[in-house]
A protein has these predicted regions:
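Caspase-like (clan CD) cysteine peptidase catalytic core
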Residues: 16, 71-157
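Short, intrinsically disordered, charge-balanced linker/junction segments flanking boundaries
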Residues: 160-166
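Boundary/activation segment at the start of structured domains
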Residues: 1-106
Length: 166
């Protein structure tokens, strides 16, 4: 376990922790407006995570994926990383979130088609399954997109009734 100390505060990053920061700012389908802030959000999150005073993640444990073309490539990369992570696993997404015709959350990639989000985007269910199946002690997802609240409903539905307070 790595510990950083500065200004009297200890920041502890569990061994074998990984963060995946996904930002999608450009789209092939004209129905999606570009989100220039998505790229900047990934850069800001990386700076926050790797700051030794704030979070202290080693830079080699923070992976940026900016403007991925295919959802399958993102999903495969997430699975590969999740399988070897036993510390903390953080997945951050900034981009468009859209709903399928059955109200399932889909995270867009550059090639996502507005009228076919479930088969051209990255479904939240896929990301949730990656998180559930990981042996990481801490699993965290941060979604900066429309319809992010659907992720809570999907987890609640798949894990049974839960008490959410706040």
């Amino acid at each position: 376990m790595e510990t950083f100390q500065e200004s009297g505060a200890d920041v502890v990053v569990p061994d074998d922790s990984h963060a995946v920061l996904i930002g999608v700012s450009a789209y092939e389908d004209a129905e999606f407006r570009p989100i220039r802030a998505a790229r900047r959000s990934v850069e800001a999150m990386r700076a926050l995570l790797t700051d030794p005073v704030l979070c202290g993640w080693p830079p080699d444990r923070v992976t940026e994926i900016v403007n991925p073309s295919l959802a399958v490539d993102v999903a495969t990369g997430l699975v590969d990383l999740a399988e070897k992570t036993t510390g903390a696993l953080l997945v951050y997404y900034a981009g468009h979130g859209v709903l399928s015709p059955r109200a399932e959350l889909c995270l867009t990639v550059t090639s996502t088609r507005w009228n076919r989000p479930k088969i051209t985007g990255l479904t939240w269910e896929t990301v949730a399954e990656v998180l559930r199946s990981s042996s990481a002690r801490v699993r965290l997802a941060i979604l900066d997109c429309c319809f992010a609240g659907q992720a809570i409903e999907a987890l609640t539905d798949s894990c049974g009734p839960q008490n959410h307070s706040g």
